[in-house]
Amino acid sequence: NSYIGNKDAYRRAMYQPRPKSNSEQINRLAKLALNYHPGEEWQYSAATSVVGHLVEIISGKSLDVFLKERIFNPLDMPDTHFYLDNTKGGRLTAQYTPGKDKKIILQDPGSERSRWVTAPRNIFSGSGGLVSTAIDYLKFQQMILNKGELNGVRILAPNTVSLMLENHTGNLPIWLTGPGTGFGLGYGVILDRGKSSSPLSEGSVYWGGAYCTISWIDREKDLVGLMMTQVRPYTHINIRRDFQVMTYQAIVD
């Protein structure tokens, strides 16, 4: 996670003008200077977009096709896509953003008018952009909790899952999640409950989405937590933490 030294240059490389393919976007990023050498700091970045494009190069398939064939179909996740056609677009909920005077503003109308239905279908980002359902994503998280297997279908080797859930950042500060946390391969990791002020057990992994979604895996409690909302930004509400606290308050043994 060593990208990117200049935020304006990073933004232009990612979005201005809108790239026509993953290859175009990543080639733009590759021309930028690093902010620091790998291992010196942790930074939230487009690192997994780079990984997603590497998957495309190695597999010879677009990322959407690769994920569908290797993960979504085997795990029976029929409602997880980068873009939706009209047959499923009607089920997509609207998205909101807080406005002035505590008013709620419609950000995306959902249904067939949503940008997830109408947008050009040429970018499949490893960093985000999937739409899904709680049931579908629960299957994925349960597979991780089960060390790579769900309903007799093995997606990952147990050692691979273990590697994903370990802290790979040492004592580097993770500014996005605060003290007492580290970062694995795609997940934040709770290292110290006291310092993190998290109700999750130490060793639990978690991450959230741009629209205030949150999910975590607590191996000590044999628990997967998942909450979906549709609001962005969400710094004015504590619903993600409140949901976690209430979940652990309900556990009596």
Where are these regions (language model features)?
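Short, surface-exposed loop or secondary-structure junction motifs
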Residues: 1-202
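Short strand-connecting beta-turns/loops that link adjacent beta-strands
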Residues: 87, 220-221
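Short, well-ordered beta-strand micro-motif
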Residues: 188-189, 216-218
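Short, structured beta-strand/loop micro-motifs enriched in basic residues and often containing a Trp
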Residues: 206
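Short, well-ordered beta-strand elements
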Residues: 214-216, 222-231
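Generic C-terminus detector
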Residues: 232-253
